Amino acid sequence: MSAAVLVADGDRPREGGADREVVDVAVGVLVREGGDFLLTSRPPGKVYEGYWEFPGGKLETGESVEAALRRELQEEIGITIGAVHPWRVELVDYPHALVRLNFCKVFAWEGELHMREGQAFAWQTLPVQVQPVLPGTVPVLAWFAAERGFQAATHTVTN
């Protein structure tokens, strides 16, 4: 996990105050053979609607990151994933929740992508062309840039 907590929209009040619980989330970083990766938009009616992120979802009580990732990707985008490769963990302080994002790389899956929650999807390379990018997604783009020797901006910042 990174040393610091990423604070998203720091000018906005935090729901639940300083002592709120951490919400664990399993996040799938699906990477195709050519190196492009999958981003999905947040569904209508959810916090940060329309922002782009890596797919995934909350862990249920007693569920492992891998089990949650398998379940969420089947439920949300209709695929069955192969091996799960735990990659990085990032703690993000959003106004609505304190979230621990457990990023896992996935290189193999079966099935066709079906966005079951009304979201859009896009296969991307650096710099990503979709916007706006969810704050918790930005560190992943930086990690990809470091791995790939990419030195330009990873995304466009919108206000």
Say what each PLM segment does:
Residues 6-37, 58, 89:
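Conserved N-terminal beta-strand and adjoining loop/helix that marks the start
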Residues 105, 114-148:
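NUDIX/MutT-family hydrolases
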Residues 76-83:
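Short secondary-structure junctions
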Residues 32, 80, 89-113, 120:
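Active-site-adjacent beta-strand/loop module that shapes the phosphate/pyrophosphate-binding cleft
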